[in-house]
Amino acid sequence: MSKRKILMPVRTVAEWGGVHEWTVDAASALVKPGQEVTFVGSGGGVQERAEATGASFKVVNWKKGWKKVAQQVGEEGNFDLIFSHAPAARQFGLVANEIAQKEHVVMIHGAYHDFMYEWSDQVDAFVAASPSLVHFVQRFGRVAPWKVSNLPNAAPDEVFELPLLSHDEKLKDGVGHIVTASRLSKDKTPQIDSVEEAVRALSELYPDIKWQIDVCGDGPLRDYFDRRYRMLSRELKNVSHVMHGWVLPQDVPQMMNNAFLTVTAGMAGMRALASGSLCLGTGARATVGIQTGKNLRAGIWSNFGDHGVFRFTPTSVSGDLKELASSSAYDRAVSVARAVIKQSNSQNIVNGMMLSALQCE
């Protein structure tokens, strides 16, 4: 089989986020063995990162004129596979492929049905970012089950090489860090409640520790997040918060590595566990608790609550934190979670799954 020429339309509403990170990592993995990748997107930061992998980039205005560009791309036909990401991007792919008649694989990153039942017969396969989304696409999108496979989020291999810091090391200076990492928008507001629940429990369990909430990310509700955390800091005297804004992707795992607890979901959840942080999974559709035991199973299944989970009730956050207040229990929980993720969601493993799903050499 010859190397493939892959057209990758990508469209998201945020300047940077999990979908961007996923597709840039994917491009890197595809280019390395010799596949040709051409992004279609709005430019900006994602273009810079995509081109750094060796991929080409075609800039498109998603608000106007994209359909004409898609038709032109289809007429040129300089690809043998379309790998689309997010609804507007799959529309681009469908328009281009109506002319080109090549293979088309659609990646599903979130729980939106996108009227899949109206167009699923026009694409060759679906890959979904969690087992929860596989179920969603088959059941609610009404896509033929054989067409759908799981291609999960991953953590970079190098993140697993960060040293595992113990419970005592993370608190040795009298300061404990609680990291959140996400776009600051409406669908992420449940994380505030989870942070509040956790920090209340930690303040009581460790009254002599000063707890700092490190908020990584930005977005339309930045002021709301800031206000809520400021109110919490005023109420609990040993709690403060810092709004870091967007942090470089490679620096986020280091912050998580030093954190006693990370409250997040999605790709950031994978990075939290890989980095050696205790993680409280809170996503757009569910809270799946402190990531140990059955909570960890539900977290991996649902992308840490971002994609929804059915017939599941997490264990008590305060109860779990109390049980993990001993150094040995905390250290074991962190070590087990990292090992589980390394065996199923390290970047190298997921890269192989992607090459297989796209039928690349």
Feature names for model-found ranges:
Residues 9-63, 219-225:
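N-terminal strand-loop element at the rim of the active site
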Residues 117, 154-175, 189-192:
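Acidic anion/phosphate-binding donor-loop and adjacent secondary structure
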Residues 124-148, 155-159:
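A short, active-site helix/loop in glycosyltransferases that binds the activated sugar's phosphate group
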Residues 18, 165-166, 310-359:
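A charged, aromatic-enriched C-terminal amphipathic alpha-helix characteristic of glycosyltransferases
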Residues 56, 225-247:
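Nucleotide-activated donor-binding/catalytic signature segment of Leloir-type glycosyltransferases, i.e.
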Residues 84-90, 108:
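Short His-centered aromatic/hydrophobic patch
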Residues 5-9, 169-200, 214:
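Conserved donor-binding/catalytic core segment of Leloir-type glycosyltransferases
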